[in-house]
């Protein structure tokens, strides 16, 4: 079902200071400010250079880490708070923070750390290689998207509503599907 999301661009991984981010562009009608400081999950498919297809889901399992778009702390955001809702967060600021730990900084020193210039990015790439078997060049053939992490849940003390990512889009698809499924009950005219 087509729902708003953050699509990961090709060749997206970059390091800014010690922070590692994924470059994105938003898809669909979103209120950009609602996508900051919430847990996001990555979903998608990566086709490796050898042709192998890998399904990726990071952030939906309770044991998974989540990723997210950072935002300014309230006491540093005076200028930001003066902007109207459409401008509080610009689309180009919706890059996803995926890590900050430099290679070789953990308890066990990493022999691969060496003189690597972008050690945090190198560490993220090492983790992706270890868990999923893909390298930086495999991002070129990847279709990855970030969506709010977590399942849909009942809303309201009386459980009378449902709250979840894409619920407004999905409820329309459900009613359309139900309408089609009942068309066999109509008489030809």
Task: Tell where the protein language model's regions lie, with residue ranges.
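Alpha-helical support elements that line or immediately flank enzyme active sites
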Residues: 173-181
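Beta-strand segments within the central parallel beta-sheet cores of soluble alpha/beta enzyme folds
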Residues: 19-21, 141-145, 185
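Soluble metallo-hydrolase cores and metallopeptidase-like ectodomains found primarily
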Residues: 59-164
């Amino acid at each position: 079902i087509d729902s708003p999301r953050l699509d990961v661009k090709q060749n997206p991984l970059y390091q800014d200071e010690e922070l590692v981010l994924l470059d994105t562009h938003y898809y669909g009608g979103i209120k950009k400010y609602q996508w900051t400081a919430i847990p996001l999950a990555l979903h998608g498919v990566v086709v490796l250079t050898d042709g192998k297809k890998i399904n990726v889901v990071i952030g939906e399992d309770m044991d998974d880490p989540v990723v997210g778009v950072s935002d300014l702390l309230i006491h540093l955001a005076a200028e930001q708070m003066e902007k109207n809702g459409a401008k509080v967060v610009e689309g180009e600021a919706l890059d996803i923070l995926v890590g900050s730990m430099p290679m070789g900084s953990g308890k066990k020193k990493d022999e691969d750390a060496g003189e690597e210039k972008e050690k945090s990015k190198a560490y993220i790439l090492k983790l992706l290689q270890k868990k999923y078997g893909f390298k930086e060049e495999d991002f070129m053939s990847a279709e990855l998207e970030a969506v709010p992490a977590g399942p849909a849940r009942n809303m309201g003390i009386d459980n009378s509503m449902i709250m979840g990512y894409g619920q407004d889009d999905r409820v329309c698809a459900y009613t359309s599907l139900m309408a089609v499924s009942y068309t066999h009950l109509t008489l030809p005219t």
